[in-house]
């Protein structure tokens, strides 16, 4: 009847992959917080701790954070003091691709896994199921990134007031930040026409240290009809930063199918960079009002 016969490439595939179900999931979000506070005439305190976890709705994406904070202050005779300390630790495993865009481009006739392709993942071919979309499951399994951040921020102050008109105050603060970024790319492909790549690992670290120290002397007094207030002080600021990056290729695979990703296990293409910066500033200040 003039109707062309069905060709092999037009036949219905044995696969019916629901890429949305493969990539998206119901994510568990957890958020826990506990705090303790109290005090009296001579001082007060506040302590809190928290944990937050988000598994992420897309495949391969997770985030968690630990936090701790303490704040105290007190007074004893001529002395008063206080401090504020905050610490946080975060771990992030981000997506390496736009998973929403990728699963929309993948045909349901393409399986998630295909042992005939390098790495064992399906992504179609030029003869049938032709697409240049990215298999998001393959990419998240073959390319992994983990970011870890530690931060400690704290301040301490101490005031000595032997007379109503005269006081000395010390203030010190630190801000410590440690960042690690680990990336690994295993052997295998996640889309058509990809060039072969050997297993590769990259690691980066940034360490930042900031410090502030202040000393101030305050005078405030009336002399009959006259009034004088004055401030005399000094401040010191110090900053240090160090960055380190390293990369290796050709990592061995263990018996369980995982790679040995320690940088020293990389067998070729060793690359390293290291940078350091440091600066400091000291200032003197004074003011008199009459």
Predicted feature residues:
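Surface-exposed loop/interface segments of Gram-negative outer-membrane beta-barrel transport/assembly proteins
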Residues: 1-16, 56-153, 169-283
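Periplasmic N-terminal accessory/gating domains of Gram-negative outer-membrane beta-barrel systems
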Residues: 16-27
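Predominantly transmembrane beta-strands of Gram-negative outer membrane beta-barrel pores used
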Residues: 23-24, 31-53, 57, 69-75, ...
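Structured alpha-helical segments in the cores of large, soluble enzyme domains
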Residues: 28, 32-38, 280-290
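Outer-membrane beta-barrel channels and translocator barrels
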Residues: 29, 40-41, 75-79, 161-163, ...
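Short glycine/proline-enriched loop/turn "hinge" motifs that connect secondary-structure elements
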Residues: 35-41, 188, 252-255, 289
């Amino acid at each position: 009847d003039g109707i062309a016969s069905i060709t092999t490439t037009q036949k219905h595939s044995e696969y019916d992959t629901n890429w949305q179900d493969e990539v998206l999931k119901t994510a568990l979000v957890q958020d826990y917080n506990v705090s303790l506070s109290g005090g009296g005439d001579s001082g007060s305190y506040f302590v809190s701790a928290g944990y937050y976890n988000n598994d992420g709705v897309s495949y391969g994406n997770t985030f968690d954070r630990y936090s701790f904070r303490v704040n105290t202050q007190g007074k004893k005779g001529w002395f008063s003091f206080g401090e504020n300390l905050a610490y946080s630790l975060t771990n992030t495993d981000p997506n390496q691709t736009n998973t929403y865009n990728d699963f929309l481009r993948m045909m349901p006739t393409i399986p998630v896994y295909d042992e005939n392709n390098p790495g064992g993942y399906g992504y179609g071919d030029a003869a049938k199921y032709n697409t240049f979309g990215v298999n998001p499951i393959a990419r998240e399994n073959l390319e992994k990134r983990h970011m870890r951040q530690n931060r400690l921020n704290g301040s301490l102050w101490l005031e000595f007031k032997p007379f109503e008109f005269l006081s000395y105050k010390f203030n010190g603060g630190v801000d410590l930040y440690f960042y690690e970024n680990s990336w690994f790319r295993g052997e295998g492909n996640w889309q058509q026409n990809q060039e072969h790549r050997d297993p590769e690992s990259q690691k980066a670290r940034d360490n930042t240290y900031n410090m502030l120290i202040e000393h101030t002397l305050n005078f405030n007094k009336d002399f009959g009809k006259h009034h004088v207030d004055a401030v005399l002080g000094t401040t010191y600021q110090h900053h240090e930063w160090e960055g380190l990056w390293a990369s290796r290729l050709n990592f061995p695979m263990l018996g369980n199918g995982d790679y040995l990703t320690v940088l020293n296990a990389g067998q070729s293409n060793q690359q390293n960079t290291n940078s350091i910066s440091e600066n400091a500033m000291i200032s003197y200040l004074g003011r008199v009002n009459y």
